[in-house]
């Protein structure tokens, strides 16, 4: 893709190593409220704003408890959020995926802005950024979280806000990079010029192939072949 002005990256599984900690914490948050959700179903909602993902799973597996949702959803989310914050602040092995920081620097050197967006809240995101030293010395031009816009993915609001912050007006000059189905949907809904999936996170290559992103890459440095 020529003439790209902004590349928007997902975080966990795309630019930050995730060894299954997010889905595990999600499952445990439900279990702590005596709710059992199959792991394969949690896998499917990775990438969504977490309060939305919780509601989706409750509607599928516990529709008979709908009257309790106003209490259950924030309670499960609070448990998940605190678990993730504690995990990320304590996890000394947390690291960027190979090539992420070098890629940010490369794009900056050729005048392309970079940004991060995520289904996490700002509280969790700041814990990740702090652990990676990305909060004190940010390698990207902007970061936005799902609780800072009216709706999370697949709505286009996070990408649109990042465009505003980075001074980009044409979504055709924006590249979206992520590891989940909802990343692809978000990129399509924002009318991004290029939607790229990576196999380093929640979805396998075969799963991603069925979702028809513009490109599927095995590592971030493969982006250099797509964006000039």
Q: How should each PLM-predicted stretch be described?
A:
Residues 40, 51, 98-101, 185, ...:
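Residues in well-ordered alpha-helical elements
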Residues 1-5, 105, 121-123, 127-228:
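Asp-based, Mg2+/Mn2+-dependent phosphohydrolase catalytic module
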Residues 92-95, 117, 150-154:
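Short, well-structured alpha-helical patches and their helix-loop capping segments
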Residues 2-98, 105-110, 126:
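N-terminal helical cap/lid subdomain that shapes the substrate entry/recognition surface
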Residues 10, 118-120:
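Conserved phosphate-coupling serine/threonine residues in phosphotransfer and NTP-handling enzymes
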